[in-house]
């Protein structure tokens, strides 16, 4: 069985992680966050990529695609090896740019099926406010205004065109993410139940 993948995209603070956690509780999906995998790899003392990843994250830049895809592929393989019923994956925060997408298409062609893109659409103002609020408790080094401005610019320049590309293929499920967690999840449920 090939992994069945749903890409989860949206600006910083759009609620991707929160909604993915809800989906995992209610459906047979495994949540893989490209950012979390990179942060874990960065903090592993024996990691060959740790320092490299660290400098990219601090600068608000996108980590080289081979590193990210390697971590994603390894995580999917390990999950499916542990339990063959777990072949559905939510990949959150990837692909973030053209280079990511090309890398995925090259490396994963025929190895995984992308079902659709779940796009959490939210204004920049709401995203920034949410991240600053989260920064008070998350301890994330990139939840400050300066990093956020950079991350939003990166998102608008790099990730939005990817979403538009998938839209042309009719593969995007767009959700208004400016509403409450429950309202957003109600839309998510409708989409996933249609897909089942």
Curated annotation (Swiss-Prot):
Classification via HAMAP family: Adenylate_kinase_Adk, Adenylate_kinase_UMP_CMP_kin
Chemical reaction(s) catalysed: CMP + ATP = CDP + ADP; dCMP + ATP = dCDP + ADP; UMP + ATP = UDP + ADP; a 2'-deoxyribonucleoside 5'-diphosphate + ATP = a 2'-deoxyribonucleoside 5'-triphosphate + ADP
Keyword Glycosyltransferase included in the entry's annotation: no
Residues reported to bind a ribonucleoside 5'-phosphate: 39, 61-63, 93-96, 140, 151
Residue numbers binding CMP: 100
Annotated Gene Ontology cellular component terms: cytoplasm; nucleus
Region: LID, residue numbers: 133-143
Name this protein carries in UniProt: UMP-CMP kinase
Co-factor remark: Binds 1 Mg(2+) ion per monomer.
Organism: Danio rerio (Zebrafish)
Family label: Belongs to the adenylate kinase family. UMP-CMP kinase subfamily.
An MF annotation (GO) of this entry: nucleoside diphosphate kinase activity
Compartment annotation: Nucleus; Cytoplasm
Sequence segments annotated as region (NMP): 33-63
Role: Catalyzes the phosphorylation of pyrimidine nucleoside monophosphates at the expense of ATP. Plays an important role in de novo pyrimidine nucleotide biosynthesis. Has preference for UMP and CMP as phosphate acceptors. Also displays broad nucleoside diphosphate kinase activity.
Family matches, as Pfam families: ADK
Binding of ATP, residues: 13-18, 134, 179
GO BP term, example: CDP biosynthetic process
Cofactor: Mg(2+)
Domain-level remarks: Consists of three domains, a large central CORE domain and two small peripheral domains, NMPbind and LID, which undergo movements during catalysis. The LID domain closes over the site of phosphoryl transfer upon ATP binding. Assembling and dissambling the active center during each catalytic cycle provides an effective means to prevent ATP hydrolysis.
SUPFAM superfamilies on file: P-loop containing nucleoside triphosphate hydrolases (SSF52540)
This protein's encoding gene: cmpk
